[in-house]
Amino acid sequence: MQIFVKTLTGKTIALEVEASDTIENVKAKIQDKEGIPPDQQRLIFAGKQLEEGRTLADYNIQKESTLHLVLRLRGGVMEPTLEALAKKYNWEKKVCRRCYARLPVRATNCRKKGCGHCSNLRMKKKLR
């Protein structure tokens, strides 16, 4: 039977499958046609994400049904140069010893009125 897979870009892919095919098989066919690795694919049908290990028949997917392909979001890794820049921005500061206001490195007096613009400053402590 023929089913359709619609991507978020609006492209529709036609696939030749059997009702007994597993979701892994469908993802492999999508990889053959589009080059998207199966571990990055999420298939949605009738508002539900299709789980690997189950068949098309388990989800009552029939001929000419349309599945929606969503790519899995990857994240959590920051580029080393960007991480160094973030650390520099967050940790190269001075702190007022009276009111704990964060100040730029070149500051000589506190910017807050509450501590009387004191000059009692220290470098911000680094995390261990």
Swiss-Prot record:
Q: Which residues form the Ubiquitin-like domain?
A: 1-76
Q: Which family does it belong to?
A: In the N-terminal section; belongs to the ubiquitin family.
The region annotated as signal peptide is none
Give any GO molecular function from the UniProt entry: structural constituent of ribosome
Q: Which InterPro entries match?
A: Ribosomal_eL40_dom, Ribosomal_eL40_sf, Ribosomal_zn-bd, Ubiquitin-like_dom, Ubiquitin-like_domsf, Ubiquitin_CS, Ubiquitin_dom, Ubiquitin_ubiquitin-like
* Provenance organism: Trypanosoma brucei brucei
Q: Which UniProt keyword terms apply here?
A: Cytoplasm, Isopeptide bond, Nucleus, Ribonucleoprotein, Ribosomal protein, Ubl conjugation
Q: Where is this cross-link: Glycyl lysine isopeptide (Gly-Lys) (interchain with K-? in acceptor proteins)?
A: 76
PROSITE patterns reported for this sequence: UBIQUITIN_1, UBIQUITIN_2
Q: Which GO terms describe its cellular component?
A: cytoplasm; nucleus; ribonucleoprotein complex; ribosome
A Gene Ontology biological process noted in the UniProt record is: translation
Name-wise, this protein is: Ubiquitin-ribosomal protein eL40 fusion protein
- Site of covalent link Glycyl lysine isopeptide (Lys-Gly) (interchain with G-Cter in ubiquitin): 48
Q: Which Gene3D superfamilies match?
A: 4.10.1060.50, Phosphatidylinositol 3-kinase Catalytic Subunit, Chain A, domain 1 (3.10.20.90)
Which SUPFAM superfamilies does the annotation name?
Ubiquitin-like (SSF54236), Zn-binding ribosomal proteins (SSF57829)
| PANTHER family, alphabetized | UBIQUITIN
